[in-house]
Amino acid sequence: MPTLSFARLHYTYPEAASRALDGVDLEIDFGLTLLTGASGSGKSTLLRVCNGLIPHFHGGVIGGSARVLDRDVIRTPTRELARDVGFVFQDPELQAVYPSVERDVAFGLENLGVARGEMLRRVGDALEMCGIVHLRSRAVGTLSGGERQRLALAGVLAMRPRLLVLDEPLSQLDPEGSAALLGALHAAVQGGTMALVAEHRHHLVLERADRCLLMAGGRVTPCAPDGPVQPAPARASQDAPASSELSWRLHQVTAGPAGVAVLHDLDLAGGTGEVVALTGANGSGKTTLLRTIAGLLPPLAGSVERRPGRIAYLPQNPSALLHRATVRTEIDWTLRRTHAAGRADAMLEEMGLAAVAERDPRDLSSGQRQRAALAAVLAGSPSLVLLDEPTRGMDGAARAALTAALVRVAGRGGSAVVATHDPQLVAAVATRVVELGDGVARVRQPLAEAAR
């Protein structure tokens, strides 16, 4: 009996005009399956059928057959499926329950009634598999986005599910974190767990995958696991203004969340027409630096200087910025606040969002939400743009739109600082690379070397 079996499966979200899944036929019974496809193709929707969130939480109209671990998903309560189906969401920030790392990993085991001794062993094993034993006593609120992704996987692995479902698990991870997560995933599969992984950075997963599936238009077709990897984008044409002025400066800045310093005595500056890429391991202080430049996190010592003008800040979790009924009204709201002319249609086209302009941002895929939030913060031509992991959940077309947007910002005399683990983005747009580590900053050049 296949672990996962879908036949003529179709699904439509509440009030949606078209199907998100449109006749999926699929059987999988072992190993690691990689699920690829453009943003909005139906990947997250298909994954949410696996643990019963569709239809039991999201509602909507579902038809056909969906069986997981020999259970009828349409008729089986989500709580029953959760015992055997481990799920890691696109937004790990929303998955943590307890304020401490160790307690959060133990949460699922507590619900299963696992004995304390066995619980402690499983928690320790899961932390070790994900390479986060050193975070055991940390508060969840102090973790970076990548560290939270590894925490979410540890909590799921501790429950030893029969089916592991991961939605963009590598989106915020540095190379070390990606290697640790893929190693943990491989160990779980070798131990008999079946895994279904949706991932845009598919080249990282391909060598370990037993099969590859492509989603398009709500349907699934096989693709070769050893198929071609999307080439790196060419270096964007970026003509900076002839004269560069100071955009922002940190003078002997020490900074960190909750009064705990993670950056020490930094002296950094950025000029107009410049795109600075911030690189470094998860937890190295990239988000702290962005928030300090933005004025959202006062420095513990030192001073911050900013050129007058509007600052646009995109956090790691784009959902924090999206509160209005449609994508268009999100952009219109920014334009009204900045007294800019109505460029909503142009911005929607530039970011590839015209087809979802009247959709609720909360109903979009992760990559589409990322683009919607980016369009909203860029509307009104800000003078300083600060982006935290902007390629999270983005497909190739969305990355190209982001690259073009950053080039436009620099070309009109603005400046940008981008925290990223994406070497392709660094190679495409960065005029300077600043690597963070051990609380200090190092400028890395040439760009080709920094992007490796």
PLM segments and residue spans:
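ABC-family nucleotide-binding domains
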Residues: 174, 395
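Hydrophobic anchor residue at the start of the ABC signature
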Residues: 153, 374
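Catalytic Walker B motif of ABC-type/P-loop ATPase nucleotide-binding domains
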Residues: 164-168, 385-388
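ABC ATPase NBD Q-loop/coupling interface
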Residues: 65-80, 295-318
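H-loop/switch region of ABC-family ATPase nucleotide-binding domains
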Residues: 198-200, 420-421
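Conserved ABC ATPase "signature" region
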Residues: 117-135, 341-356
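Conserved ABC ATPase signature
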Residues: 139-143, 147, 360-364, 368
